[in-house]
Amino acid sequence: GTAAVQLAKYYGAQIHAVANTKNIELIKSLGAEKVFDYTQEDFTKQNEQYDVILDAVGKSSYFKCKHLLKSGGVYFSTELGYAMQNMWLSLVTVFMNKKTKFPIPTDNQQDILLFKKIIEEGKYRAIIERVYPLHEIIEATKYVETGQKTGNIVIQVNEG
């Protein structure tokens, strides 16, 4: 989520994001023009429409967001969704006006060089919420699974 906001900003997108109360200012500082506080409102109940919706944490669905997509709009999710629906919808919606895409991560050199450039230009900063020593990796995983993390969790492999 925090990386996506910064990358979208780099490309000049107008960004509306969804976060909890404690993260609103952080998300705005990364480039979001408007932030919906999900503890106060359901962003799917508003009337604005978007070219792209990215669900970076798997809290929504194509079906909840479809009416928010403009004609030709695309819903991305980083999660498989209920019964792996996002993977299947990415195939089914190929011929529809509003699509779902399920991104499959790759490690191509072009993407790595782009992130290097953005970092060197000072237009990207890693948001690191917590650092766990390797022997606490189970606790780190449990924390990530709560869905309450902001940014990244780092596992420190070597002490010192």
Name each model-derived stretch.
Residues G1-G160:
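Terminal helix/beta-alpha structural elements that buttress the NAD(P)+-binding lobe
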